[in-house]
Design a protein with these regions (language model features):
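Extended ligand-binding regions for polar small-molecule ligands
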Residues: 86-96, 155-159, 165-176, 181, ...
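Bacterial lipoprotein signal-peptidase II cleavage site
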Residues: 17-30
Length: 313
């Protein structure tokens, strides 16, 4: 009896154990499958998060500017980057959330060398357009202001000299200009347009600003081709280095020469984004607002109407 019962039980027991084994294997496989899927989902989510983070990462941009070209670019009493051009780029920065601008004050020489080498991404120094410079840097289509140029002359001649044309008729006896300077080219272009009354254009090496003013006061020359902010800062301002000449010298505006930010050649995407922002700021009147704040007048009104990058001035 016992032997027969045991023989009957053993096959049944083996069947049950086999079923448990199959069930356990199935459960383990299912668990493994779920875990693998969960791991894949987690990896995908992490990948998507990483991609999103990369796409939205803020790019830091180094904006170099000159240290003491007041009021265009300078370092204020608090040690902060300031000036008209810096203010324009701070306004641009607010419009471009994908970028964060860091301002670096430096010399004009280091600015150009560093910008070309990629040390800086943007350079601000009241730059005029030249074909030679455009070979090294990116100019946007939109300028951001101008350098107002004209002549400093003896106040005693104010009835006869009111602009560059009347000065040319008066004598045209101009303080010599370096032939490498953009001012030299401007007077050359003036003479082409006024062949009957040209200005005496004499090439010269660099000289001290005080010499130019003194030569005019002495009568050696009748005018000095100068930038208005330089005249205002050095002669008109009460703390100007040559304020003692303020009652003896006057200034007559010729025209506004557009100024531009420069971009490293590898930063075309940044240049395009900033160019679009400049156009919008100009349209909204923000540039005129900043001009009035830093200069007390419009730096746009004396730019020749219809001027485009590359036009003769």
């Amino acid at each position: 009896m016992k032997i027969r019962s045991l023989a009957a039980i053993i096959p049944a027991l083996l069947l049950v154990l086999g079923g448990c084994s199959n069930s356990s294997s199935s459960t383990t496989a299912a668990d493994t499958s779920v875990a693998a899927q969960s791991s894949a989902d987690s990896s995908m989510a992490a990948s998507e998060l990483e991609t999103g983070s990369s796409d939205s990462e803020v790019k830091k941009i180094k904006v170099a500017h000159t240290q003491s070209y007041y009021p265009y670019d300078f370092v204020n009493d608090k040690g902060e980057s300031d000036g008209y051009e810096v203010a324009v780029f701070k306004a641009i920065d607010e419009m471009l959330p994908e970028y964060e601008f860091e301002y670096v004050s430096t010399t004009a020489e280091d600015l150009l060398i560093g910008l070309e080498a990629g040390k800086y991404d943007v350079g601000l120094k009241g730059v005029w357009w030249t074909a030679e410079r455009e070979e090294k840097f990116i100019y946007p289509e939109n300028y951001i202001g101008s350098s107002v140029i004209g002549i400093a002359f003896r106040t005693e001649n104010a009835n006869e000299i009111t602009d560059l044309e009347s000065f040319a008729r008066y004598s045209g006896n101009l303080v010599p200009i370096s032939p490498q300077s953009a001012q030299y080219t401007i007077i050359e272009n003036f003479n082409k347009e006024h062949p009957d009354t040209p200005i005496k254009l004499t090439p010269a090496d660099q000289f001290e600003l005080s010499d130019a003013y003194q030569w005019v006061l002495e009568g050696r020359y009748d005018a000095f081709f100068n930038i208005k902010v330089s005249f205002d800062t050095n002669v008109v301002a009460e703390d100007g280095e040559y304020h003692q000449f303020a009652d003896k010298l006057s200034f007559a505006t010729y025209k506004g020469i557009p100024i531009w930010p420069l971009f490293n050649k590898e930063k075309s995407e940044l240049a395009t984004a900033c160019d679009d922002a400049i156009a919008k700021l100009k349209e909204e009147g923000k540039l005129e607002e900043l001009s009035d704040k830093y200069f007390g007048y419009s730096v746009f009104k004396d730019i020749p109407e219809g001027y485009k990058k590359g036009d003769d001035l």
